[in-house]
Amino acid sequence: MATTKQETPQQQCPDFLFEVSWEVCNKVGGIHTVIATKALTMTQSLGDKYILVGPDIHREGVNPEFEEDPNLLRAWKQSVYNDGIRIKVGRWKVNGNPIAILVDFTSFFPHKDDILKFLWETYRVDSISGQWDYIEPVLFGYAAGKVIESYVENFTTSTDKVAAHFHEWMTSSGGLYLRKMSPYIATLFTTHATVLGRSLAGNGQALYGNLA
């Protein structure tokens, strides 16, 4: 009888790992802490092959968490710009100083209907009643997916194991984009809270005691 060969932890570890979150270099809540506190461990393991992707919220001002490096990935940054995507490349000022790519998703505003159409026709994601508090994160996630796709095409080989980890619904369109357009990139999605969990916790219910 044939047996399945078990992979070692080293074989399971990706050669390149991207993490995408609305809270990369942009503190809103607890996800910022989750990612920032793991950055040192990840950079010790993967070095500059561990890359964070977040939104360029401070487009015209100074982001206190981010240090831009105009020489880092300079040629690739220009090629991405030539494709119509504006990004900043630098380091997140947390322990480990990982590479961070901040994406200005506003250039996708004129294409929002095409992007929402793609999500509907491919995955039946219904955006008909979505307002801008929904549309902007969708555009960011989609743009982040395209940035990751471009990086992988330029800097990896066919034997490299590449994974992209998307945090919360605000980035999920990026995972859907890669699943369709770049299926060779493994995708992961993590939700950090649910409506049910927030409701129970907010009303003083013994959530953890009832889990058993």
What are these regions (language model features)?
Residues 1-212:
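Catalytic cores of nucleotide-sugar-dependent glycosyltransferases that transfer UDP/GDP/TDP-activated
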